[in-house]
């Protein structure tokens, strides 16, 4: 078998860091929207 060079994903370190930065920003944005949505629903109809 041929040896693999570099990372498993095939990305360079800089590309991987850039991808990670955008992935984290997207995750934080999604989580913020979910928290706001849950808060608004809880204000409308408290479940506790």
Curated annotation (Swiss-Prot):
Listed GO CC annotations: plasma membrane; plasma membrane light-harvesting complex
Ranges annotated as spanning the membrane = 22-44
- Write out the topological domains of type Cytoplasmic: 2-21
For the Periplasmic compartment, the record's topological domain ranges are 45-48
Q: Which UniProt keywords apply?
A: Antenna complex, Bacteriochlorophyll, Cell inner membrane, Cell membrane, Chlorophyll, Chromophore, Light-harvesting polypeptide, Magnesium, Membrane, Metal-binding, Transmembrane, Transmembrane helix
Q: Which domain of life is it from?
A: Bacteria
Q: Enumerate the subcellular locations listed in this protein's record, separating them with semicolons.
A: Cell inner membrane
Any Gene Ontology biological process: photosynthesis, light reaction
Chief localisation class? membrane
Tell me the residue numbers annotated for binding a bacteriochlorophyll: 20, 38
**Membrane topology, record value:** Single-pass type II membrane protein
- GO terms of molecular function: bacteriochlorophyll binding; electron transporter, transferring electrons within the cyclic electron transport pathway of photosynthesis activity; metal ion binding
Q: How does it assemble?
A: An alpha/beta heterodimer. The core complex is formed by different alpha and beta chains, binding bacteriochlorophyll molecules, and arranged most probably in tetrameric structures disposed around the reaction center. The non-pigmented gamma chains may constitute additional components.
Function as written in the Swiss-Prot or TrEMBL entry? Antenna complexes are light-harvesting systems, which transfer the excitation energy to the reaction centers.
Spell out the family assignment given in the record's similarity comment.
Belongs to the antenna complex beta subunit family.
Protein name as catalogued: Light-harvesting protein B-870 beta chain
Gene encoding the protein: pufB
């Amino acid at each position: 078998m041929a040896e693999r060079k570099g990372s498993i994903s095939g990305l360079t370190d800089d590309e991987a860091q850039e991808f990670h930065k955008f992935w984290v920003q997207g995750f934080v944005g999604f989580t913020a929207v979910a928290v706001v949505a849950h808060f608004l629903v809880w204000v409308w109809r408290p479940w506790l």
